[in-house]
Regions:
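An active-site metal/cofactor-coordinating segment within enzyme catalytic domains
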Residues: 1-7
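Active-site-adjacent beta->alpha loops and helix N-cap segments on the catalytic face
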Residues: 5, 28-43, 57-59, 82-97, ...
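Extracellular lectin-like interaction modules
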Residues: 7-11, 64
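Catalytic beta/alpha-barrel core
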Residues: 14, 18-33, 47-56, 73-84
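Glycine-enriched alpha-helix->loop->beta-strand junction motifs that scaffold or abut catalytic
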Residues: 19-23, 38-48, 68-74, 98-102, ...
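Anionic-ligand binding region
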Residues: 60-67
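C-terminal alpha-helical cap/extension of soluble enzyme domains
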Residues: 86, 92-156
């Protein structure tokens, strides 16, 4: 998500990861387009992602459609809400995309406001959630223990 490296270094890192034959590899689409283009043969293992640590952009639906059209295994978006309605908008956009294009979308709103989005996949169709083992790797991330507890209650 939030890493500042040259395009050459980014591609080098991704190629190194692929030598370990991971189930999936996360590739930033809008900030590292050339790396995505160089790895198109690995679409079936690719989580095509978009991170925005500042806002929920008004063109998010269009971005998701563009990413979906690339034909990767999953499309992931992580955005920073400024208001409660930003979280609700993300939940609705995720649901709309899932109903229209299938169940390969992953979405989350970051920060304290976004915590609901991390556990509401059963409502929106977001097919993954992310939890921390010890230290949070993203703003608003919930621990694995808390995530399991909450999801267990919600799935009863």
């Amino acid at each position: 998500g939030n890493i500042q490296v040259s395009e050459k270094k980014y591609l080098q890192i991704l190629k190194e990861i692929l030598t370990y034959n991971p189930a999936y590899i996360d590739v930033e689409f809008f900030t590292h387009g050339p790396s995505f283009a160089a790895l198109k043969d690995f679409r079936d293992k690719m989580v095509l992602s978009y991170h925005n640590f500042d806002e929920v952009p008004t063109d998010l639906t269009n971005r998701l459609i563009k990413m979906h059209e690339e034909g990767t295994a999953f499309v992931k978006v992580a955005v920073m809400p400024e208001r409660e309605c930003d979280v609700l908008d993300l939940l609705q956009i995720t649901r709309d995309m899932t109903l229209e294009y299938g169940d390969h979308f992953i979405s989350m709103a970051m920060g304290d406001l976004g915590r609901l989005s991390r556990i509401s996949g059963y409502l929106t169709g977001s097919c993954w959630t992310f939890a921390s083992l010890e230290n949070s790797s993203a703003p608003g991330q919930i621990s694995l223990k808390e995530t399991e507890y909450i999801l267990d209650i919600l799935e009863k």
